[in-house]
Amino acid sequence: MHGPKATLQDIVLHLEPQNEIPVDLLCHEQLSDSEEENDEIDGVNHQHLPARRAEPQRHTMLCMCCKCEARIKLVVESSADDLRAFQQLFLNTLSFVCPWCASQQ
């Protein structure tokens, strides 16, 4: 750098590869022509096995009280499909009431 401010000519980077050996980035893997897809680990054809139930996961939802509009944090544990069915109830008539409004009734 020459002077108090840097100029573009002062900040020129010369990038060069660290190794001179060229690296082949192509994948030379060949897939088998078998019609059945086998699992790599156990060799079992999973297409004919019954479907496993999805593992439940924890989901956090922020809802509003239908009376005072206070925020309510709801935590459920379910599969993604069951959670989707639960969310469909919100589109109909299902509403939540906060503990304070529930105690006032």
UniProtKB/Swiss-Prot annotation:
Highly phosphorylated. GO terms for cellular component: host cell cytoplasm; host cell nucleus. Homodimer. Homooligomer. Interacts with host RB1; this interaction induces dissociation of RB1-E2F1 complex thereby disrupting RB1 activity. Interacts with host EP300; this interaction represses EP300 transcriptional activity. Interacts with protein E2; this interaction inhibits E7 oncogenic activity. Interacts with host TMEM173/STING; this interaction impairs the ability of TMEM173/STING to sense cytosolic DNA and promote the production of type I interferon (IFN-alpha and IFN-beta). Residues 1-49 are annotated as: E7 terminal domain. The keyword Transmembrane helix does not apply. A motif (LXCXE motif) lies at residues 25-29. HAMAP family: PPV_E7. One of its GO terms (biological process) is DNA-templated transcription. SUPFAM superfamilies: E7 C-terminal domain-like. This is Protein E7. Its main location: host cell. A motif (Nuclear export signal) lies at residues 83-91. Plays a role in viral genome replication by driving entry of quiescent cells into the cell cycle. Stimulation of progression from G1 to S phase allows the virus to efficiently use the cellular DNA replicating machinery to achieve viral genome replication. E7 protein has both transforming and trans-activating activities. Induces the disassembly of the E2F1 transcription factor from RB1, with subsequent transcriptional activation of E2F1-regulated S-phase genes. Interferes with host histone deacetylation mediated by HDAC1 and HDAC2, leading to transcription activation. Belongs to the papillomaviridae E7 protein family. It is found in: Host cytoplasm; Host nucleus. One of its GO terms (molecular function) is protein domain specific binding. The gene is E7. A zinc finger (unnamed) spans 65-101. Gene3D superfamilies: 3.30.160.330.
